[in-house]
Amino acid sequence: MARSDEDTWDLASSVGATATMVAAARAVASRGPDTLIDDPYADALVRAVGVEYFVKLLDGEITLEADNAAMLAVMTDVMAVRTRFFDDFFLSSGLPQAVILASGLDARTYRLPWPSGSVVYEIDQPEVIEFKTRTLADLGASPAAELRTVAIDLRDDWPRALRDRGFDPTAPTAWIAEGLLIYLPPDAQDRLFDNITALSAPGSRLATEFHPDAGARIGASSQRMAEEWRRHGLDLDMADLFYDGERNPVVDYLRERGWEVEARSRPDMFAHYGRPFPTGEAVEALRQSLAVTATRR
């Protein structure tokens, strides 16, 4: 189903299901002796959501055609590298105030070694926030920093809701927008960064990712995966969840608004973490992605 301005979701449908998919990839990527990440909560969160395909994937009960199996392996590596990039961003920022935008099933507030006195704000739709908070509590997990949830759609007045939860715009803040931009209309992407800029004191830091030509390239590969998923009973076409339209390049947009920006290609990120980047036409869309970090002047 195509997106609309008023659409909503839980963790088993629409954009929410992609959060569960990412958590499943994190769970798989956390296994084995040579892992880049350690997410001890991802497996349990995916099982709690209960999407049969993702549970079977965790249990090794899904047999994919060769091309799609290879793509799944690539995507697992992509999620491992991406997760590690954002983990390292928070760990290196040294800032006691952090915001996770569209937090989904992200468990960083629970699993990272936050400095004493850290406050982490997680923003997502109310049903998503409630589910993750309750499930992790049922697992006996406790946040490693002070957690303040902000249950609101990012298309609404989230800056006000964030301040109402105690956010201090005069304090430098570490922000992440992971796996988010492609699900926003181009104008909403600009508003997101405008709001972040308005809320960021000098010294604030931001990490995100940008996919040039995202809709066309990634949409085509997503449709191939959607056909395979339907064979296994999962009705999810990620191409329907993306917003088309020309976007302002994130690097230029942030620089014009007072940020010092660095960007690294996905192959460079793979090399940085000691992983070979795959070759072939199927991964060309992934090759174009940029890992972006910025510091507010």
UniProtKB/Swiss-Prot annotation:
GO terms for molecular function: methyltransferase activity. S-adenosyl-L-methionine binds at D124, D153, L154. It comes from the Bacteria. The keyword Amino-acid biosynthesis does not apply. One of its GO terms (biological process) is methylation. Keywords: Methyltransferase, S-adenosyl-L-methionine, Transferase. Pfam families: LCM. InterPro entries: Ppm1/Ppm2/Tcmp (IPR007213), SAM-dependent_MTases_sf (IPR029063), SAM_mthyl_Trfase_ML2640-like (IPR011610). SUPFAM superfamilies: S-adenosyl-L-methionine-dependent methyltransferases. Its EC number is 2.1.1.-. It is an enzyme of class 2 (transferase). The keyword S-adenosyl-L-methionine applies. Belongs to the UPF0677 family. Exhibits S-adenosyl-L-methionine-dependent methyltransferase activity. This is Putative S-adenosyl-L-methionine-dependent methyltransferase Mkms_1060.
